[in-house]
């Protein structure tokens, strides 16, 4: 037990307390015992760096305040919904996973929009409080992040868009069909 604590202290000194905290949450459900294995900690550390890099380009703050894209709004609100539900179930490992998925999506979109990223900082603050507080001040806020309201999701951003599906015969794509997810069936005149 003493040896384990010493390794945790070494990890904390090398990667930071928030990386260690998130790694422990990411290991699995809190009610289950988990073997201590440090091989995955660099992945959590890389995730936090990737999150940080959404705000910075070559070490300089690089954020915009444009109208967010529909894809980035969907990613944000999907994450807020999932993390909120998972916190209520104390499913902290899936919260961390949801953050990772969101940051990967926003990185692919090259999102540096403060209207998307600010709520994400607030959302991650219970999981990585030191990281979130530092980032909060880096983007120009004067008050602590702890005073901010928890972000709420809006269902209008969670609606699935149309999907394209390839149709294949004998392993070769012949054509693509579209599934219109926003269509509804008429209910009047149905017997």
Where are the regions that the model predicts?
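Helix-rich, typically C-terminal accessory recognition domains appended to large enzymatic cores
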Residues: 12-176
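Single conserved hydrophobic/aromatic residue that forms the stacking wall/gate
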Residues: 1-7, 11, 182-191
């Amino acid at each position: 037990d003493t040896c384990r604590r010493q390794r945790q202290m070494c990890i904390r000194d090398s990667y930071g307390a928030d990386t260690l905290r998130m790694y422990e949450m990411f290991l699995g459900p809190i009610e289950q015992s988990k073997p201590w294995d440090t091989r995955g900690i660099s992945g959590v550390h890389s995730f936090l760096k990737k999150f940080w890099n959404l705000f910075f380009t070559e070490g300089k703050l690089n954020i915009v305040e444009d109208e967010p894209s529909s894809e980035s709004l969907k990613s944000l609100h999907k994450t807020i919904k999932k993390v909120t539900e998972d916190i209520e179930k104390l499913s902290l490992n899936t919260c961390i996973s949801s953050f990772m998925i969101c940051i990967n999506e926003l990185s692919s979109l090259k999102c540096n929009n403060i209207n998307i990223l600010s709520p994400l900082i607030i959302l991650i603050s219970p999981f990585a409080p030191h990281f979130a507080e530092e980032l909060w001040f880096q983007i120009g806020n004067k008050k602590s992040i702890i005073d901010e309201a928890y972000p709420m999701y809006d269902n209008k951003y969670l609606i699935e868009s149309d999907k394209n599906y390839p149709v294949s015969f004998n392993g070769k794509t012949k054509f693509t069909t579209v599934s219109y997810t926003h269509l509804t069936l008429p209910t009047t005149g149905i017997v």
